[in-house]
């Protein structure tokens, strides 16, 4: 539920559209 290198992920992690680097963990 968080971005790699960040504390929070925006949008849907599965779509990889909520993370600046495009990588989401959990």
Swiss-Prot record:
MF term (GO), any: toxin activity
Pfam families: Toxin_2 (PF00451)
Tagged with keyword Magnesium: no
Keywords linked to the UniProt accession: Disulfide bond, Ion channel impairing toxin, Potassium channel impairing toxin, Secreted, Toxin
Domain of life: Eukaryota
Chief location of this protein within or outside the cell: secreted
Function: Blocks voltage-gated potassium channels.
Entry note about domains: Has the structural arrangement of an alpha-helix connected to antiparallel beta-sheets by disulfide bonds (CS-alpha/beta).
Assigned protein family: Belongs to the short scorpion toxin superfamily. Potassium channel inhibitor family. Alpha-KTx 06 subfamily.
UniProt name for this protein: Potassium channel toxin alpha-KTx6 OcyKTx1
Species, as recorded: Opisthacanthus cayaporum (South American scorpion)
């Amino acid at each position: 539920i968080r971005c790699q290198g960040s504390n929070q992920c925006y949008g849907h992690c599965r779509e990889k559209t909520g993370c600046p680097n495009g990588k989401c963990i959990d």
